[in-house]
Amino acid sequence: NVVYEDHFFTVYKEIKRLRSLLPLYYFGTEIGVNAIVLKYRIPSSTHQVNKSIAPLQDAQQAIYLARTNASEWGIDKNKIGIMGFSAGGHLASTAATHYEDIKVTNPGNTSYRPNFQILIYPVISFSSYGHKGSRDNLIGPVINEDQVHYFSNEEHINKNAPPAFLVHAKDDGAVLVANSINYYKQLLENQVAAELYLFEKGGHGFGMKNNTSEVHWPQLMQQWMIKNNIINK
């Protein structure tokens, strides 16, 4: 499972973020999931020809490496999924919906389609209800309708989209819950296996445990993965 975290800006923040992911690693190990963390490039006009595709290039390269090295790494190449939190959720959902638009070299004609997607309070859309900060960071403050459409991932779901598990809080003031709801609606319309869990409260960035609820979403995720034959009981 490739985990797309948000960007790391300093050594301190990198260590802090990696530590914050440890419970996820431990839980994954318990249920039989190996995690690969992707530290992807921050979009930058100074040294990238097209900064908007740099993160997607890194995501696709991560999927390529995982799939082509699956035997050596002891993983199932047909059960390689993606997981993203917040802005990392936008990258994960971009990889899940644009896997046929390959932005990297593919000498072995490897499939870039993830086998499943797990999105936790994700940025999905660059439309009116999307997250302006994520949009500006990726494509800039000047509105380009073609790019807004391209990176509004709810608009690119089809019947071949990977099965999806989503979690969001209704009172999320940073990334509106409409991101997950509209993505889920499109998954349903295209008859893609999907499950959405909405917390009444919790805001944004609650991580592995929403302290406002007795429900723990990692256990829900585990049951969903079992139902979809991703992991064993």
Label the predicted regions.
Residues G173-N179:
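Conserved alpha/beta-hydrolase "acid-adjacent" motif
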Residues V2, Q61-H131, V148-H149:
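Primarily recognizes the serine-hydrolase "nucleophile elbow" in alpha/beta-hydrolase
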Residues N160, F165-H168, D172:
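Short beta-strand/loop motif that positions the catalytic acidic residue
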Residues I181-K233:
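C-terminal catalytic histidine-bearing segment of alpha/beta-hydrolase fold enzymes
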Residues R17-L18, L24-Y25, I36-K77, N210-H216:
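Catalytic nucleophile-loop/oxyanion-hole region of alpha/beta-hydrolase
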